[in-house]
């Protein structure tokens, strides 16, 4: 409870209430938190923390594995549940508000940028290893897999690195467009947000709370809200002295948000997040696994129904930057976003959505888009509707290749393997 109390007290302070008023002023604070969801977040996070530690070969220290769950009401921005750690008194770091590399969950923002800049879900992109113009480091997919030319929809579903770098490079000021899309959704710029053609691969750090809120914007027709814990404040006489306004900003074009959601449902229906289909209601989401050299530093699943957006992040070590591979599932090649993070998300969301009305997402109207040239050509054969030029490559190359989750078999999904990342 300490993490939640700290968040509420900080919010009240930001609203102008003094410590004296908060601690002994007779105020009654009504929060946005849902007790059943909060209990489920705590139970699920602690269950899989312990399971990952005890089933690891060899067994690992559960206290060094950190799970964060942040769940947001898509209509209001109210925080429904938040798990930031097991014990505020022994470790007050709240992992739900701690930014870490967002990995392939950041590709959703690149998809927003692409749809705004002349591409559609049917536009074709490079699915094979290639070296961007002016760079010396090739972009590779998981296992160095070669997909051939792929649609943007398939690139989202299968988390194909090369396609997103190809699209970002081909847009006018592509990296800036991706960053703007992320900011518009509700993810604030932070560490790792270098404006280069690999921005979509997810070195950019975002907290689980902000990521849940950013995806909530996609769920609610592109409307961004401010996350908050305080719904209402009453004085000692029961009079309402504060009530959250739940104001929304149309930050992403409604049909762009609908198309991104449509693509993210492909992740669940046929891609790396297939396990989320167990909710038996419309679900959109994205896996993410961040790799630096041979170290997995963060693993994610961020997904939403029409009403609830939830981000799950796993990190390890005191800093949250240590290798997660020690905690990988037996038989897995690495620690995947499609493993424990997705399993945690599904189990939590089964409780969170129980009894809720099954609501459909907005119907996406097709966006007419252009295609990048076939893989053998270094430049687009057909330019998108806007005037576009290749964004200059950064002088320094990223040292990491954020990994995709790999191709899902057509049979019952399993966590796909991760090859040794190529960081040259």
Where do the PLM segments sit?
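Extended, hydrophobic alpha-helical segments in both membrane/secreted and soluble proteins
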Residues: 79-80, 102-115, 121, 163-164, ...
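Short active-site loop at a secondary-structure junction
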Residues: 65-66, 89-109, 117, 121-127, ...
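Non-catalytic, structured segments within soluble enzyme domains
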Residues: 1-32, 183-184, 197-201, 216
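Short helix/loop segment immediately N-terminal to the Walker
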Residues: 20, 52-63, 193
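Conserved catalytic neighborhood of penicillin-recognizing serine enzymes
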Residues: 119-178, 224, 236-266
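Proline/serine/threonine-rich low-complexity "mucin-like" segments in extracytoplasmic/periplasmic regions
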Residues: 363-424
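Mid-domain, small-residue-enriched loop/turn segments at the edges of structured enzyme/sensor domains
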Residues: 138-140, 172-213
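A penicillin-recognizing enzyme superfamily signal
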Residues: 31-59, 69-71, 82-83, 88-101, ...
């Amino acid at each position: 409870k300490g993490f939640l109390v700290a968040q509420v007290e900080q919010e009240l302070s930001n609203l102008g209430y003094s410590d004296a008023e908060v601690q002994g002023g007779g105020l009654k604070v009504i929060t946005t938190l849902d007790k059943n969801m909060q209990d489920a977040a705590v139970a699920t996070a602690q269950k899989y923390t312990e399971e990952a530690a005890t089933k690891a070969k060899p067994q690992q220290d559960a206290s060094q594995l950190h799970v964060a769950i942040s769940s947001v009401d898509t209509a209001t921005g109210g925080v429904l549940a938040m798990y930031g750690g097991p014990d505020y008194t022994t470790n007050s770091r709240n992992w739900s508000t701690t930014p870490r590399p967002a990995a392939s969950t950041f590709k959703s923002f690149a998809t927003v940028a692409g749809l705004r800049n002349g591409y559609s879900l049917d536009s074709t992109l490079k699915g094979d290893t290639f070296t961007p113009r002016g760079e010396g480091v090739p972009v590779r997919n998981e296992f160095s897999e070669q997909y051939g030319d792929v649609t943007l929809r398939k690139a989202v579903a299968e988390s194909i690195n090369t396609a997103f770098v190809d699209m970002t490079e081909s847009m006018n000021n592509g990296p800036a467009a991706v960053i703007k899309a992320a900011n518009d959704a509700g993810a604030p710029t932070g560490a790792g947000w270098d404006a280069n053609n690999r921005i979509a691969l997810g070195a950019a750090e975002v907290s689980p709370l902000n990521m849940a809120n950013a995806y909530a914007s996609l769920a609610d027709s592109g409307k961004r809200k401010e996350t908050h814990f305080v719904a209402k404040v009453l004085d000692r006489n029961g009079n309402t002295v504060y009530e959250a306004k739940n104001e929304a900003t149309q930050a992403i074009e409604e049909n762009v948000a609908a198309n991104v959601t449509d693509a993210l449902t492909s992740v669940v229906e046929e891609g790396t997040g297939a396990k989320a289909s167990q909710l038996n209601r419309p679900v959109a989401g994205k896996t993410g696994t961040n790799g630096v050299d041979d170290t997995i530093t963060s693993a994610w699943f961020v997904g939403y129904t029409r009403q609830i957006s939830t981000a799950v992040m796993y990190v390890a070590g005191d800093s949250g930057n240590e290798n997660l591979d020690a905690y990988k599932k037996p038989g897995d090649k690495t620690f995947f976003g499609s493993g424990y993070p997705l399993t945690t998300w599904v189990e939590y969301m089964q409780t969170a959505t129980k009894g809720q009305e099954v609501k459909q997402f907005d119907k996406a109207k097709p966006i007419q888009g252009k295609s990048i040239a076939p893989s053998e050509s270094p430049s687009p054969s057909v330019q998108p509707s806007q005037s576009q030029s290749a964004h200059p490559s950064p002088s320094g190359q990223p040292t990491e290749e954020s990994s995709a989750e790999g191709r899902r078999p057509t049979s019952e999904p399993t966590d796909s393997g991760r090859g040794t990342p190529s960081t040259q």
